[in-house]
């Protein structure tokens, strides 16, 4: 998968150039553990490799998934979610180094 920018918006294409996630995002990051970080209207979420939302954009910031968890920021506090988007450690920390 490759991130591509078209008309100021980001999306993803596969190796043949087929659009997997149409360019509609303000920003994107590479895939990690099968999910890619995407920003839409100032909030971050994750899409899967079919281009569908795995976790809807609702976080102020997010980190990559590692060992099934990703750090997330809500209201200037950090915690962790699992791959279903469930908060497993409540955002209550000023910072996380994961």
What are these regions (language model features)?
Residues 1-98:
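Residue-level detector of conserved, function-critical positions
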């Amino acid at each position: 998968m490759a991130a591509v920018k078209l008309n100021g918006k980001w999306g993803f294409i596969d190796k043949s150039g087929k659009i997997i996630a149409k360019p509609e995002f303000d920003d994107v990051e590479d895939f990690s553990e099968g999910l890619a970080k995407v920003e839409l209207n100032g909030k971050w979420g994750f899409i899967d490799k079919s281009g569908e939302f795995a976790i809807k954009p609702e976080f102020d910031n997010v980190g990559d998934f590692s060992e099934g968890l990703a750090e997330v920021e809500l209201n200037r506090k950090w915690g962790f979610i699992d791959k279903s988007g469930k908060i497993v450690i409540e955002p209550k920390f000023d910072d996380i180094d994961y």
